[in-house]
Protein backbone atom coordinates (compact mmCIF):
# COMPACT_ATOMS: atom_id res chain seq x y z
CA UNK A 1 0.00 0.00 0.00
CA UNK A 2 2.85 2.39 0.79
CA UNK A 3 4.12 2.14 -2.80
CA UNK A 4 0.78 3.39 -4.10
CA UNK A 5 1.25 6.56 -2.06
CA UNK A 6 4.66 7.53 -3.45
CA UNK A 7 4.83 10.40 -5.92
CA UNK A 8 4.35 9.19 -9.47
CA UNK A 9 3.57 10.77 -12.83
CA UNK A 10 3.31 10.03 -16.54
CA UNK A 11 4.29 12.20 -19.50
CA UNK A 12 1.39 12.99 -21.81
CA UNK A 13 1.32 14.82 -25.13
CA UNK A 14 -1.32 17.54 -25.26
CA UNK A 15 -2.24 19.88 -28.10
CA UNK A 16 -2.89 23.56 -27.37
CA UNK A 17 -6.61 24.19 -28.04
CA UNK A 18 -5.79 27.69 -29.29
CA UNK A 19 -2.79 27.30 -31.62
CA UNK A 20 -2.43 23.53 -31.97
CA UNK A 21 1.16 23.44 -30.69
CA UNK A 22 2.00 20.07 -29.12
CA UNK A 23 3.29 19.87 -25.55
CA UNK A 24 4.76 17.10 -23.44
CA UNK A 25 3.14 17.54 -20.02
CA UNK A 26 3.85 15.87 -16.68
CA UNK A 27 0.59 14.58 -15.17
CA UNK A 28 0.80 13.39 -11.57
CA UNK A 29 -1.03 10.26 -10.48
CA UNK A 30 0.15 10.61 -6.86
CA UNK A 31 1.41 13.77 -5.17
CA UNK A 32 3.08 12.94 -1.86
CA UNK A 33 4.04 16.24 -0.24
CA UNK A 34 5.64 14.46 2.72
CA UNK A 35 8.11 13.07 0.22
CA UNK A 36 8.23 16.09 -2.14
CA UNK A 37 7.21 19.20 -0.19
CA UNK A 38 7.68 21.60 -3.13
CA UNK A 39 4.73 20.07 -4.94
CA UNK A 40 2.35 21.59 -2.38
CA UNK A 41 3.59 25.07 -3.31
CA UNK A 42 3.16 24.20 -6.99
CA UNK A 43 -0.49 23.33 -6.33
CA UNK A 44 -1.21 26.40 -4.21
CA UNK A 45 0.38 28.75 -6.77
CA UNK A 46 -1.64 27.20 -9.62
CA UNK A 47 1.40 25.81 -11.39
CA UNK A 48 0.88 22.07 -11.17
CA UNK A 49 -2.66 21.67 -12.51
CA UNK A 50 -2.09 24.17 -15.28
CA UNK A 51 -1.73 24.01 -19.07
CA UNK A 52 0.58 26.72 -20.38
CA UNK A 53 1.51 27.08 -24.06
CA UNK A 54 4.93 28.62 -24.66
CA UNK A 55 4.00 29.16 -28.31
CA UNK A 56 0.91 31.39 -27.95
CA UNK A 57 0.89 31.93 -24.13
CA UNK A 58 -2.54 30.33 -23.78
CA UNK A 59 -3.20 29.20 -20.19
CA UNK A 60 -5.96 27.10 -18.67
CA UNK A 61 -6.51 24.97 -15.55
CA UNK A 62 -5.99 21.27 -16.17
CA UNK A 63 -8.03 19.09 -13.83
CA UNK A 64 -7.42 15.35 -13.83
CA UNK A 65 -7.71 12.48 -11.37
CA UNK A 66 -4.86 12.30 -8.86
CA UNK A 67 -4.17 11.43 -5.23
CA UNK A 68 -2.76 14.03 -2.80
CA UNK A 69 -1.01 12.57 0.26
CA UNK A 70 0.25 14.39 3.35
CA UNK A 71 1.30 11.94 6.06
CA UNK A 72 2.25 14.75 8.46
CA UNK A 73 -1.30 16.11 8.30
CA UNK A 74 -2.69 12.55 8.23
CA UNK A 75 -4.78 13.12 5.11
CA UNK A 76 -5.32 11.72 1.62
CA UNK A 77 -7.36 13.71 -0.90
CA UNK A 78 -8.47 12.10 -4.14
CA UNK A 79 -9.38 14.56 -6.89
CA UNK A 80 -11.68 12.96 -9.46
CA UNK A 81 -13.38 15.40 -11.88
CA UNK A 82 -15.38 12.50 -13.32
CA UNK A 83 -15.97 9.25 -11.45
CA UNK A 84 -15.59 5.99 -13.36
CA UNK A 85 -15.16 2.27 -12.62
CA UNK A 86 -11.35 2.44 -12.68
CA UNK A 87 -11.24 5.28 -10.14
CA UNK A 88 -13.80 3.54 -7.92
CA UNK A 89 -11.63 0.41 -7.88
CA UNK A 90 -8.54 2.45 -7.02
CA UNK A 91 -10.37 4.26 -4.22
CA UNK A 92 -11.67 0.96 -2.83
CA UNK A 93 -8.09 -0.32 -2.62
CA UNK A 94 -6.85 2.86 -0.93
CA UNK A 95 -9.67 2.63 1.61
CA UNK A 96 -8.09 -0.50 3.06
CA UNK A 97 -5.64 1.81 4.82
CA UNK A 98 -7.11 2.82 8.16
CA UNK A 99 -6.37 5.67 10.54
CA UNK A 100 -5.91 8.40 7.93
CA UNK A 101 -8.50 11.02 6.91
CA UNK A 102 -9.74 10.46 3.36
CA UNK A 103 -11.46 13.10 1.27
CA UNK A 104 -12.91 13.23 -2.23
CA UNK A 105 -13.02 16.42 -4.35
CA UNK A 106 -13.82 17.09 -8.00
CA UNK A 107 -12.01 20.38 -8.68
CA UNK A 108 -8.78 22.23 -7.98
CA UNK A 109 -10.29 24.96 -5.77
CA UNK A 110 -11.75 22.38 -3.40
CA UNK A 111 -8.42 20.52 -3.31
CA UNK A 112 -6.56 23.73 -2.41
CA UNK A 113 -9.14 24.55 0.26
CA UNK A 114 -8.78 21.11 1.87
CA UNK A 115 -5.00 21.56 1.91
CA UNK A 116 -5.28 24.97 3.61
CA UNK A 117 -7.70 23.65 6.21
CA UNK A 118 -5.40 20.72 7.03
CA UNK A 119 -2.35 23.00 7.19
CA UNK A 120 -4.14 25.10 9.82
CA UNK A 121 -5.02 21.99 11.87
CA UNK A 122 -8.74 22.60 11.39
CA UNK A 123 -11.55 20.15 10.64
CA UNK A 124 -13.08 20.57 7.17
CA UNK A 125 -16.36 19.12 8.46
CA UNK A 126 -16.69 22.01 10.92
CA UNK A 127 -15.70 24.51 8.21
CA UNK A 128 -18.47 23.28 5.88
CA UNK A 129 -21.07 23.58 8.66
CA UNK A 130 -19.96 27.17 9.33
CA UNK A 131 -20.31 27.97 5.62
CA UNK A 132 -23.99 26.97 5.75
CA UNK A 133 -24.48 29.16 8.82
CA UNK A 134 -22.88 32.15 7.10
CA UNK A 135 -24.91 31.64 3.92
CA UNK A 136 -28.06 31.67 6.04
CA UNK A 137 -27.00 35.11 7.31
CA UNK A 138 -26.52 36.36 3.73
CA UNK A 139 -30.08 35.69 2.56
CA UNK A 140 -30.81 39.40 2.09
CA UNK A 141 -27.70 39.92 -0.05
CA UNK A 142 -28.64 36.91 -2.16
CA UNK A 143 -32.05 38.36 -3.03
CA UNK A 144 -30.57 40.47 -5.84
CA UNK A 145 -27.33 38.58 -6.47
CA UNK A 146 -26.13 35.02 -7.02
CA UNK A 147 -23.68 33.34 -4.67
CA UNK A 148 -21.15 31.46 -6.81
CA UNK A 149 -18.89 30.00 -4.15
CA UNK A 150 -17.58 30.34 -0.61
CA UNK A 151 -14.08 29.14 0.27
CA UNK A 152 -11.93 29.05 3.39
CA UNK A 153 -8.83 31.25 3.34
CA UNK A 154 -6.29 32.58 5.81
CA UNK A 155 -3.57 35.17 6.24
CA UNK A 156 -1.05 34.14 8.89
CA UNK A 157 -3.18 33.56 12.00
CA UNK A 158 -6.36 35.18 10.67
CA UNK A 159 -9.06 32.93 9.23
CA UNK A 160 -11.79 34.03 6.83
CA UNK A 161 -14.11 32.96 4.04
CA UNK A 162 -13.89 34.36 0.53
CA UNK A 163 -17.40 34.88 -0.82
CA UNK A 164 -17.85 34.99 -4.59
CA UNK A 165 -20.93 36.85 -5.89
CA UNK A 166 -21.91 37.17 -9.54
CA UNK A 167 -22.50 40.95 -9.39
CA UNK A 168 -20.63 42.19 -6.31
CA UNK A 169 -17.50 40.14 -6.95
CA UNK A 170 -15.41 38.82 -4.07
CA UNK A 171 -16.13 39.61 -0.42
CA UNK A 172 -14.54 38.46 2.82
CA UNK A 173 -16.09 37.21 6.07
CA UNK A 174 -13.84 36.80 9.14
CA UNK A 175 -13.84 33.56 11.11
CA UNK A 176 -12.78 33.66 14.75
CA UNK A 177 -11.25 30.72 16.57
CA UNK A 178 -13.84 31.15 19.31
CA UNK A 179 -16.75 30.69 16.89
CA UNK A 180 -15.00 27.75 15.23
CA UNK A 181 -14.59 26.03 18.61
CA UNK A 182 -18.25 26.70 19.52
CA UNK A 183 -19.48 25.05 16.32
CA UNK A 184 -17.00 22.19 16.70
CA UNK A 185 -18.23 21.48 20.24
CA UNK A 186 -21.92 21.89 19.39
CA UNK A 187 -21.87 19.46 16.46
CA UNK A 188 -19.14 17.01 17.50
CA UNK A 189 -21.58 14.12 18.07
CA UNK A 190 -23.47 14.78 14.82
CA UNK A 191 -20.18 15.03 12.89
CA UNK A 192 -19.01 11.72 14.31
CA UNK A 193 -22.34 10.10 13.43
CA UNK A 194 -22.11 11.26 9.80
CA UNK A 195 -18.43 10.35 9.30
CA UNK A 196 -16.77 7.14 8.15
CA UNK A 197 -13.31 5.73 7.54
CA UNK A 198 -13.54 6.00 3.76
CA UNK A 199 -13.21 8.67 1.07
CA UNK A 200 -15.85 11.23 2.03
CA UNK A 201 -17.02 14.15 -0.06
CA UNK A 202 -17.21 16.73 2.71
CA UNK A 203 -18.93 19.77 1.24
CA UNK A 204 -21.90 22.04 1.96
CA UNK A 205 -24.33 19.36 0.83
CA UNK A 206 -22.86 17.01 3.45
CA UNK A 207 -22.97 19.75 6.10
CA UNK A 208 -26.53 20.70 5.18
CA UNK A 209 -27.76 17.21 6.04
CA UNK A 210 -26.27 17.53 9.54
CA UNK A 211 -27.82 20.96 10.11
CA UNK A 212 -31.23 19.85 8.79
CA UNK A 213 -31.25 16.70 10.94
CA UNK A 214 -30.20 18.59 14.08
CA UNK A 215 -32.29 21.74 13.53
CA UNK A 216 -34.97 20.92 16.10
CA UNK A 217 -32.43 19.57 18.59
CA UNK A 218 -30.56 22.88 18.83
CA UNK A 219 -33.47 25.30 18.44
Question: Where are the model-predicted features located?
Answer:
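Short acidic DE-rich linear segments
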Residues: 2-8, 208-219
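Long, contiguous alpha-helical scaffold regions
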Residues: 73-209
Amino acid sequence: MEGKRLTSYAMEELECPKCGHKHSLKKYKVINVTEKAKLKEEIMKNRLYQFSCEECEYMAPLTYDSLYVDSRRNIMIYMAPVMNAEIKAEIAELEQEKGIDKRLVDNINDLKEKIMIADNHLDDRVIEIIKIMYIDQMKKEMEDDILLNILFDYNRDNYCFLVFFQKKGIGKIPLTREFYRQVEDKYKDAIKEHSMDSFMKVDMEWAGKILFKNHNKFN
